[in-house]
UniProtKB/Swiss-Prot annotation:
Essential for muscle contraction. Involved in ovulation likely by regulating the contraction of gonadal myoepithelial sheath cells. The modification N6,N6,N6-trimethyllysine is found at K130. Residues 942-966, 1006-1029, 1131-1213, 1234-1255 are annotated as: Disordered. InterPro entries: Kinesin_motor_dom_sf, Myosin_head_motor_dom-like, Myosin_N, Myosin_S1_N, Myosin_tail, P-loop_NTPase, XRCC4-like_C. Disruption phenotype: Worms exhibit retarded embryonic development and paralysis. Muscle organization shows disruption with abnormalities of both the filament lattice that constitutes the A-band and the hypodermal cell. RNAi-mediated knockdown causes an accumulation in the proximal gonad of endomitotic mature oocytes in 51 percent of animals. Muscle myosin is a hexameric protein that consists of 2 heavy chain subunits (MHC), 2 alkali light chain subunits (MLC) and 2 regulatory light chain subunits (MLC-2). Residues 86-791 form the Myosin motor domain. One of its GO terms (molecular function) is cytoskeletal motor activity. This is Myosin-3. There are four different myosin heavy chains in C.elegans. Residues 1137-1164, 1176-1197 have a biased composition (Basic and acidic residues). It comes from Caenorhabditis elegans. SMART domains: MYSc. GO terms for cellular component: A band; cytoplasm; myosin filament; myosin II complex; striated muscle myosin thick filament. The lineage of its organism: Eukaryota, Metazoa, Ecdysozoa, Nematoda, Chromadorea.
Amino acid sequence: MSGNPDAFENDPGFPFLGISREARAATAARPFDSKKNCWIPDPEDGFVAAEIQSTTGEQVTVVTVKGNQITVKKDQCQEMNPPKFDKTEDMANLTFLNEASVLGNLKDRYKDLMIYTYSGLFCVVINPYKRLPIYSESVIKHFMGKRRNEMPPHLFAVSDEAYRNMVQDKENQSMLITGESGAGKTENTKKVISYFAIVGATQAASGKEAKDGKKGGTLEEQIVQTNPVLEAFGNAKTVRNNNSSRFGKFIRTHFSGSGKLAGGDIEHYLLEKSRVVRQAPGERCYHIFYQIMSGNDPSLRGKLKLSNDITYYHFCSQAELTIEGMDDKEEMRLTQEAFDIMGFEDNETMDLYRSTAGIMHMGEMKFKQRPREEQAEPDGEEDALNAAAMLGIQAEEFLKALTKPRVRVGTEWVNKGQNLEQVNWAVSGLAKAIYARMFKWIITRCNKTLDAKEIERKHFIGVLDIAGFEIFDLNSFEQLWINFVNERLQQFFNHHMFVLEQEEYKREGIAWTFIDFGLDLQACIELIEKPLGIISILDEECIVPKATDMTYAQKLLDQHLGKHPNFQKPKPPKGKQGDAHFAIVHYAGTVRYNATNFLEKNKDPLNDTAVALLKHSTDNSLMLDIWQDYQTQEEAAEAAKAGQTAGGKRGKSSSFATVSMIYRESLNNLMNMLYQTHPHFIRCIIPNEKKASGVIDSALVLNQLTCNGVLEGIRICRKGFPNRMLYPDFKHRYAILAADAAKESDPKKASVGILDKISVDGNLTDEEFKVGETKIFFKAGVLAKLEDLRDEILSRIVTMFQSRIRSYLAKAEVRRRYEQQTGLLVVQRNVRAWCTLRTWEWFKLFGKVKPMLKAGKEQEAMGELAVKIQKLEEAVQRGEIARSQLESQVADLVEEKNALFLSLETEKANLADAEERNEKLNQLKATLESKLSDITGQLEDMQERNEDLARQKKKTDQELSDTKKHVQDLELSLRKAEQEKQSRDHNIRSLQDEMANQDEAVAKLNKEKKHQEESNRKLNEDLQSEEDKVNHLEKIRNKLEQQMDELEENIDREKRSRGDIEKAKRKVEGDLKVAQENIDEITKQKHDVETTLKRKEEDLHHTNAKLAENNSIIAKLQRLIKELTARNAELEEELEAERNSRQKSDRSRSEAERELEELTERLEQQGGATAAQLEANKKREAEIAKLRREKEEDSLNHETAISSLRKRHGDSVAELTEQLETLQKLKAKSEAEKSKLQRDLEESQHATDSEVRSRQDLEKALKTIEVQYSELQTKADEQSRQLQDFAALKNRLNNENSDLNRSLEEMDNQLNSLHRLKSTLQSQLDETRRNYDEESRERQALAATAKNLEHENTILREHLDEEAESKADLTRQISKLNAEIQQWKARFDSEGLNKLEEIEAAKKALQLKVQELTDTNEGLFAKIASQEKVRFKLMQDLDDAQSDVEKAAAQVAFYEKHRRQFESIIAEWKKKTDDLSSELDAAQRDNRQLSTDLFKAKTANDELAEYLDSTRRENKSLAQEVKDLTDQLGEGGRSVAELQKIVRKLEVEKEELQKALDEAEAALEAEEAKVLRAQIEVSQIRSEIEKRIQEKEEEFENTRRNHQRALESMQATLEAETKQKEEALRIKKKLESDINDLEIALDHANRAYADAQKTIKKYMETVQELQFQIEEEQRQKDEIREQFLASEKRNAILQSEKDELAQQAEAAERARRNAEAECIELREQNNDLNAHVSALTGQRRKLEGELLAAHAELEEIANELKNAVEQGQKASADAARLAEELRQEQEHSMHIERIRKGLELQIKEMQIRLDDAENAALKGGKKIIAQLEARIRAIEQELDGEQRRHQDTEKNWRKAERRVKEVEFQVVEEKKNEERLTELVDKLQCKLKIFKRQVEEAEEVAASNLNKYKVLTAQFEQAEERADIAENALSKMRNKIRASASMAPPDGFPMVPSASSALIRSSSNARFL
């Protein structure tokens, strides 16, 4: 936009259309470096802005705006435009036109809701999904009458431009609005129509008034109100759009000569009829069905018999029923209002509603199949009655027509029974047909209303609203036609775009070669519409009996596959894609089409009997109108009988019109209409699928830009000069680049001088810009280069300006200091003088006398003043005289002052501008400096953050190591605490005197030891689980590092590793916390036990209960640990999400520190508890000190037991220490693996770089070879062309020779009659030249449009071809005529004037012929009337054509000269030629055969050379790849010996292939040398043949013999070459069998080198990925192998431990047996003891009873002990149920303990009352009990040890199994990789076979070309024979001329060859050629 009016900037809609000056200036001042700023691909945003940091070879390291630093390939970077182009309004002005810049500009503008953007001729519109204030009347007023570049991009700007072009140029206009469904096409169409209605308003009511005066409206209202009517019947809800137009329309708004609105009309295309009977999920039928059912008019549904709910009617209730935000009731009111304004009568609208309701009733008609019959019958008639009533027909006849239609069999009409499927098809087809014809009637009725007959129509503006290009998962018949329409529209745009470009280049006087890009799409268009194309074959299949969709698809494949570049076999479906039968390469991409239902949709059959009923409807006049043009079979038969012309549309007896024919006819009409208009293009874009405002889906938008042709338009722009600037603008902006040259006042001269200066400096070349009349044109990217130069110069100027200012300020400061110094010196001098004089006496006297002297001197002063006054008066007088003189001078000077003032004001303005620019520069500098400082600060912050991250990582690693050390310290402290506890327990046990208390304390300590061992075991398990977690985390870290290697994000990798470590640390800390809690619980339990002991075991039972509760808590904790382990696995799966929560790591770390502090506090508390325990132990020791002496013997026994316990505890502690050391080793190993991975990463990077460099070298070598090959191919083609040109030249010369001979005969008879016709013939010649020029222009126009007219009919195409040939012959005849005229002139000058009457007759004949030629030309003009516009524009080619005519005349003169020479030669050697003609013919035939063989051999050799070259190149690269892949596969799944064997085999194969290649190359070189020799020999033979024609008979005979010998040698050479070729083919087959991976590269080499490069890159990346995966798998296998070996070693150790355990178990069983015997003995001893106690307590009956009870309880204990022993035996026999039986054993033991404690209490009570004897007896009994309990405890300890060892064994075994499973899983993965590679090889082999087939097809094409060459050679021979005949005729004519030299020619003899006869002769010659 060149400028925005200030008034418009205040409009509310301006922020959504344009950018303010301040915002644009701020954007332009943003820092930018064109060498660093770029776009790079991004998977989410499409492209993202980045800044280049460094470049290494083809790799570039960039930092994106997101802050990520990545490395990409250089060719992936796209240039970024300078900031001045940000949010540019016309993307064609972008200096770098690429996808990234276009997408970025659209995204930036759409963020500000600026939805309109220009792209050259396009106006791109993005759906805002919200209401914007940019369509108000105020906005319309701002755009009315404004040029496009004066206002921001808007639909109104394009509309107004179209309106002004129509009014000014008197030319019809068109606006093409395209886009996907939901892009806003319909809304923009309505806005355009409204704008035209307002602009061309007539302000007069043009609507047709009804009788009541209520119907109708103004013409403007009626044009606008067509939209509600069309939307009601033509719009529907789709998945992507709630109001989607399901038809295309072309709305023409007509205007009068003065620009007033004069009516309008509508044409529609491609209505989606299938929606009437079928809707997809998420969609619904057309709006009118739901508006009728909305209840807006309650009586309407009753009239239409729609009594049921909408869901009842199947045709319109298959999916959605309502639309969010749309009120069907209100929409019905608007539709009815639109009907009223449009002037529809009530009966017309009611018929429309009735027909619509009839379709709804038809959908509910039910039919059923008769049993055992192929006949359907009605299943209920209610809906049929309703449907028939609505359609105005009889229900019975309607049902009969559907179930038993009348068909013609021979000459009779019979009723044919229909099955159920056929009836349903007939109902659906009839419903669709009724709706389609009803819609067409509505269009016709609206056109009738909009026809304002009272206003004359002069011009129109058409608006095309049609669906854009569609690529769906399943593409069918509809998509084919939509895409074909868009293909034609895109071709129209390409052609129109470059026509405009060429016109502007010509206006500006720029040399330019026209390129018609419309021809780029011609191949695809011809594939679809040409004869034997897709549509032609479809129409043919529709009339072929028993044709199916599959036969149609197969015909397409047979006809076009491999023969047409735009036809392909579809690739297998991916994702949700459906099956496809063929694929077409459109301009927007390759589309896969499914041919299902193609035939049915194309035929669109109807039931003629039912249609006949509808044509005779009695109650619905609409049916009569819509079916009026339909001709049924019966009507056609009757018309045929009556001899009438069948004018119906369809009927089998009449012409059969398919849907494709109808579509093609309407499309051709549309294209013809568009070619007669000046088009304007609107492209609508969907921003996202979510209908969210301001959000851009980059991938979706890019796809639409491709489909809409925007990127295609940009591609075309780049071919020319897309950037252009006016001379004043260029001078104003870039004058700084060449200040001297810019001093010119003429902007053009100044601009040219600036460009010359830049070109001389080497910054620009002449090809990068062109100088026009008013503008300068630039290639893409040049303006960016100029901006860089301007920025550099500005930087230098600003720097110099700053230095000058600093210099000036420094000099001013120096001057100020100098002046200050001078003043100071004067003051100092005066002060020093005053200091000297102030003490001098004379000075004092002077000071006193000086005041007194003033009074005496006043008189003298007065005298002096009088003298001065006199002098002053004289001076005043003189001043008055001078003043009078000066006043006159002042008057003159005032005028000069005014003039100077004006110039001063101008200079001030310039100075103000300069100051303003200076100020802006300063602001810009300040802004840049501030941004630079900000960026520097950001860079420093980023560096600091990186350093902080590194420090945090180091700190985290240190914290982790500290944590592990702390864990080790905790373990040491735990062990110390355990040792201290054991020592305290030992002291307690050693000090216990009382037997019962000591036994109880020992049992308690054993239990506590068990608990402690259980906690240690849990801790060991936790440590083992942590080890497993660490291993698992190491694997995850390796995978993450692999991903980071692929993405080369080292920082993210470190962060993720840190996160993993942090997580592991938190897990370890959590587990430690759990373990610490367990320890705390145990400590509490221990404290409770000691309290219980201090209270003399009174609460022992309660304590045991608490212990049981604690056991349950421990079990719960174990379950919690398992749950946490499962949760850990889930968290590991969420590891990817943890990367986004890096900020939480600090908080987690602080929480971990707090937990460590809490852990430390708890440890301290534990230390306090230990101190309390010591105090309690001391008290307990004091209480039992008195019993120490009595228990010394028992203490010794207990000391032995305690020492064994201490030993076992020490073993457990040592085991824990060993496990901790193992963890440390694993950590060190993981660190070593990490460093190894780092080294591997660096090595892989180096390998990748070397691979890239080698690939670049290979690409360079490949390019060099291809250049060499292209040069050789060019040379070969040149030689072939020379051969062909020679043959054609000879043929043409012979033909022209014969023509000239005939002309010579005629001219010799009329030489004396041409002088008087000189002027007449000259004028006729000028007329003929004009006719020729016109025909030349017509030929060019016809050539440009022939592609668009080929679809009319076959006869017209043939006629056009003949006319083109006739025109070419006519051109040659005109050239000959010019030469003849020159000859006539010469002869006339020499021979004088004769035979005036004959000349007059010849003149008349010539005029008649000229008139015939003129009539022919006029016929051609009528045929190509559609190209008149192009023909007028090509008038400028007249001069070129004239020069061509002159050149042709010169060539004819040259040929005439040669003809005379040939005449002398022919006259001299005629006789000899006749004798030797047969021999010459034989020699020539042999020569032609030899040339054919040579050409064939050369072609085969070229193909073989190309194949061998590509084979050699690809063999080298692919052999290396095969070697690498084989090495990798060998490393992954084979042994070293197999790998070496494969390597040797591959090396042998490689050597064989290399030898074969060398042999093939040698053979190829030999063949090339032979071909060259053969060509040289052929050229020599030809030269010799031509020389022998002019030499004597003897030389001719020698030449013939030499030629014969040469032929024999060539024959031998050809036979040798044939053998060598067979050998080469054998080698080629061998190479094809050996190399299976060549197909992709070969296929791509045949198609395009660029595709080959992409494929090579793709496979190189694949190889790198496979190599990396195999290396990773190899490393994992090595680890697994090591782990497996270690597992085997551990299994061996476990096996030995198992054997030891078995031995221990046997020892335990023996001990149990001994214990059982001892129990028996103890029982007997107890019995004796009981008897003794009962004897001693005879005197105390009461105590005796109690003692007996105690003995009974002891017996019960013995029984329980026996049961416990049996349970132990069962536990050793059944290891699987050991844990459960152990718990049962523990429960029994606790029960025994409780019984024993009760007994001990009873014994204590008895001890008080028993005497010493009883105490002694009881002492003996207690000893026995103590021994028994000691044995029980020993057995329990052995059981516990065995259980722990068994658990350890099971745990190790589970670990080994897990690792074995991992190994098996990795082996399976390797097998899968091998299978994938095998599949890849199979695919390559299949493609190689396809390539072989293509090679064979190419050979067939070559053979056909050779056959054609042979045919041409035969024609050449015939031409020579005709030349002989012509020579004979010439001699005869000469004799005849001599005989009749003195005789006048007869009357009517044609003196001048007529143009038509010449045309016929040339046509015959052309056909002969």
